[in-house]
Curated annotation (Swiss-Prot):
Low complexity biased stretches: 185-195
SMART domains associated with the record: RING
Domain of life: Eukaryota
UniProt record, GO biological process: protein ubiquitination
GO molecular function: transferase activity; zinc ion binding
Catalytic activity annotation: S-ubiquitinyl-[E2 ubiquitin-conjugating enzyme]-L-cysteine + [acceptor protein]-L-lysine = [E2 ubiquitin-conjugating enzyme]-L-cysteine + N(6)-ubiquitinyl-[acceptor protein]-L-lysine
Protein name as catalogued: RING-H2 finger protein ATL68
Zn finger region (RING-type): 136-178
Signal peptide: none
EC nos: 2.3.2.27
Cellular compartment(s): Membrane
Species: Arabidopsis thaliana
Amino acid sequence: MSTATLVVFPPPPPVPIPTYITSLGLGYSIAIALGFLVLISTIILSSYICCRASRLRFSASAANANANASFSDRGVIVPRIIFVAEDDDLESGNVVVGGLDHSVINSYPKFHFTKDITAVVNGDGFHDGEGRETTCSICLCEYMEEEMLRMMPECKHYFHVYCLDAWLKLNGSCPVCRNSPLPTPQSTPQSTPLSEVVPLSQYAADRRRSRR
C-alpha cells in the first residue's frame, strides 16, 4: 500500500514597489505642504495690510479733527461756509468783489454772549438794548454761553467772530442790513443781502447733532 506525500510550497515573494512611485508620492506631499504655507502667508499678509490701512485712515481723520478743534474758541468751531447768490444771471463784468482789511475787522468790538444779554457796544461803551438776537444769521446756529461774538459798529448786529470775520473779508457791509461802516460807498461795493444768500455749511448741522 502506497503512502501519499504532501508537498507544501512557500508563498511567492511580494512584488517590489518601483522606486519612482515612492519618490512621486513624496513630491506630492512636499508640494501640498508648500502650497499650504503660501496660502497661510498670503492670508496673514492681507490681514496686516488691511489693518495698516485702517489705522492710517483713522489717524488721518483724527488729525483733521484735531486741526479743526485747534481753531475753536470757547466751543466755537470755525465754519466752512460757501455763499451762493440765488441770482446768477448777472454778467461777470458787473460783479465787484471787495472786503475789509484785517486791521479794520479786528477794530470791531467783541464780547462774550450770555443768555441774559441786555447790552450792546457803541462808541462810548455799553448801553441797554432790546430785541437781542440769540441766533447767528450767518451760520444759523444759536449762540452758546460765553461764546465770543463780534458786533458791527454802526447797526449793532452781532455774529460769531469767525463767521463775521470770514464775511467781512469778502464783503464790506453788514450781512443783515447792508449797512457799511466806511464813509464812501465807492470804497465798499454793495454785497448780496443775507436774505438772498444760501449758506452751505456743515457747521450748523454739526452743532445741532452735538447738542442731542
